[in-house]
Amino acid sequence: NKLLISSLVVATTCGLTACSDSNNPNPAPETEMPAEYYVGGKLGTTFNNTASAYEQFTEAVDNQGLVASFKRGERIFESPFDIDAQSETPMRGLGPLWVRESCIACHPGYGHGARQNNYNSNTIGNGYLLVLTDENDTYLSSLTGMPQTGSSAPFKAPIDERKIQIKWLPYTDEWNNTFPDGESYSLIYPEVTIPQDAFYVPLQVGGVDIDYSQLRVRLENTIGIYGTGLLDAISDDDIRAQYRAEEAAGVSLNPGIWANGDFVSYYTNNVQGDGTKYVRRYTYALSRGSIQDGPGANAIWNITNVTRSDRRYHYMTAAYAKVASKDPDVQAQFYKYYPAMNKTGNVETDIYNYLMSN
């Protein structure tokens, strides 16, 4: 009976709502919300409280008439790309090498990646990216900044991800894993090993071979998409002041980014941008400086290696192109998969030129 009464009340309420006048000639004026309601600022706050709120556009997007653009970007973000190059395939152009087949694979629900026990790039929610450097923390030049483990025929992946090992080990911190009130907690950290035979390319820094013993491997995990744009609201002066404070305190800072009280280098883009200098503030490697040309705007293309009309080049290293162009297995099948690339009759040259977008 209680269920029946509740159902009747809900039905009656819905009926009354449906009969209300939706064309009120004297609508109540919109009231400005208190400042504390805009936790993400007026441009970054949504009042959508559904289960998918973090995937929705904000009020500012709607007010500027940008919902259609948001939806187009959402489709690119959420859809896996295909290696099929036929014009009727909507999400085509994956490869020839890639980090992931889609953006959402690393950002499920637009959030961060989940902890993994192995490096399988096809696992939805695996937001791990490899960070490969020498013992001086200099990135390997023979691999892309975000190393690729996927490939389409006839090419071979730069790293065989099946051989990557991830072990989670216990860790004891400086407080002996104990809160001030005596309660204890446990910590773990990943130990990542990539055997030497997993690499298809030589290990190089600045184009010079290094010994395998010099290799350092770290894991970088994705962060949630929502809220990251607020980093753009931090002024350059505030970032500069933070660097100066840390330098004065004796903190070891990257000399390639900061030295003697100021930035050594800035982020610029002379290809899709106008060459404006930006303070580096995005990505693990501080390789981006503006939200309009930030990690997401570039990763959509770098992660999948999809090209576009104003970005006609592959996310690729010359070291990989050189190795692949000399690989007999690749040479034997290249014209089968890429007949239009038979431009010189020299298969080694054609492979190299294709990969390097020459």
Label for each model-derived stretch:
Residues 48-49, 53-69, 78-358:
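Extracytoplasmic redox metalloprotein regions
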